[in-house]
């Protein structure tokens, strides 16, 4: 199973992809989406959305977990 984890934030959104096979889990990719405070809100949200969509398209997770 492939899981995309997201730690949401407007200035910095962290993400990571793990893959599990049986009892073995490994990190496949991770990163941080940084947006600038002086950019309009809609542009910042658009950047976050676009990069999360890229991760979903590339890694095709079966589940997504979002930190509360």
Regions found by a protein language model. Give the residues of each.
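Phosphate- and other anionic-substrate recognition elements at nucleic-acid/protein interfaces
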Residues: 1-68
């Amino acid at each position: 199973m492939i899981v995309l984890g997201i730690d949401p934030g407007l200035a910095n959104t962290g993400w990571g992809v793990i893959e599990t096979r049986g009892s073995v889990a490994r990190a496949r990719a991770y990163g941080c989406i940084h947006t600038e405070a002086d950019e309009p809100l809609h542009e910042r949200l658009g950047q976050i959305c676009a990069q999360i969509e890229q991760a979903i398209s590339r890694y095709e997770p079966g589940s997504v977990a979002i930190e509360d």
